[in-house]
Amino acid sequence: GYGYYHNLRYSFHYRDQIYAGITAEKNAGEPFFTGQNKKGYDFYSLYLLIRNIGHIKTLALGNYRVSYGYGLVINTDFGMGKTATLSTLGNKSRGIRKHSSTDEYNYFQGMAVSYKLAKRWTLDGFYSYRKMDGIVGNQFIRSLKKDGYHRLCREFEKKNTLTNQLVGSNLNYNGKYCELGLTAVYNVFNKPLNPEKKYYNIYYPRGKDFYNVGGDYKFFWKRFSLLGETAIDKCGTWATMNMLRYSPKGGTQLIVMNRYYDAKYQSVYARSIGEGSTVQNESGFYIGLETSILKYIKMTCYGDFFYFPWKKYLVSKAGTKGLDGLLQLSYSPTYELEMFIRYRYKKKEKDFTAEDKTKQTIPSIQQKCRYQLNYSVKDKLTLKTIADYVRINFRGQSASNGFLVSQSAAYTFHLLPLQLDLSAAWFNTDDYNSRLTIYEKSVLYAFSMPSFYYKGMRVAVNARYELNKHIILQAKYGTTHYFNRDKISSALEEIDGSTKSDLYLQLRLKF
């Protein structure tokens, strides 16, 4: 297919009761009404969500998401993990929601309902049947394909090669001093899931069917709250996360949390707080504090000590450990001015190959510093300055360093219905390991956090214009120029040159 990306969204809502919509997406390189795709867009998502009709709190048809407890059984939410603010860390999941994004993996397809049994009791039930992408060989599912790309023949060969059925339920009690929940999920593939065995994936989910049961709780007493969840899988292996939160006056938050995710615990759709990306093979202890130390100065800090009982990808040694620590000081004397400085230290054991080809597992240390200044002028002009530094090295080895400086300005015109955002960034890193990432404003629904490495500059312009209350135009143009490269990326995405540009156009119609 041609190299342009585009998507189409239609959404309808009536008050806060009825939501309906369709999302269609074509990734760059995917065929459009041609080749192996005669139906136009590569991905379609339809949904209908109804709220607060009698005893029915929520009814979802089509594509939807569900998340319960603290994610040890099922969670399709996007979360910031340990880097979330302490006030939101450990918030309970939100139950049933519509799936209106272009994510082609984290959703379910079928029906979900939330029914109010009594004043404080709610019962949810959900069913899903969907085709999924994956690599299938010798009647086994070798891996699940989650990126949603269908550009080449080899990618089309992995499209809709397997099916997954899922049924689940959640019983929830919402009391004055406590919240209790019980979640059960059963899901089955049409073929056994059996990844090719590697040293790190011995305990990955394997088999045709999986079921998990978990109980979550939250107790309140004055300014204390105790919360957590414990779950087991079909083999009786368990995972647990428990947190104590103290919230005195003045915006102070003190959190102490422990987690234990057994190396053999298996849940296909679990996602929770941790150093790893799965609820498996990890235990840890976290302590965090957010408080005002002076009139205009707020301090945020945390320390997370973690341990992996079994081997991991690029870690061929069992029983490795690490530390993740953060300290941030924020200064905000007025509504218009805010600045902070942040330092983050992370130490993890990883495999390292020496010059003589010998391999050993030694500590890898990553240090990051950021200074950020936000300044606004009479709700018209907003300025943001960022300076980033990162240093990464294995113990006893030379370090990889990276620097980035960026400046952005957002201006809202009062005589015109126009908002303009400009940004520029200069970066200089030794290699890919010391890459730096910043948030960049884009058009609605397009989340942009580009990573920068080697040497170069990035410039972006974002404009939003309201023709009237029904028509909104938005456009973004960005270009990245590298000073020390004559080729960018590799394989299908390789660019023969030192400049990479991107253009976004969006038209919104509101009725």
Report each predicted region and the residues it spans:
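Outer-membrane beta-barrel proteins
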Residues: 25-43, 97-104, 157-160, 231-233, ...
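Surface-exposed loop/turn segments flanking beta-strands in extracellular/periplasmic regions
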Residues: 80-91, 137-153, 441-446
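Aromatic- and glycine-enriched pocket-lining scaffold segments that form the walls
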Residues: 105-152, 160-162, 166-170
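Conserved catalytic-core segments centered on acid/base and nucleophilic motifs
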Residues: 10, 48, 59, 113, ...
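Exposed, low-structure sequence patches enriched in small/polar residues
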Residues: 3-5, 162-195, 202-511
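Beta-stranded membrane pore/translocator domains
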Residues: 2-3, 36-41, 59-63, 127, ...
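Outer-membrane beta-barrel translocator/receptor signature
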Residues: 2-7, 12-20, 24-30, 36-44, ...
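Outer membrane beta-barrel
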Residues: 38-96, 100-133, 248-267, 417-432
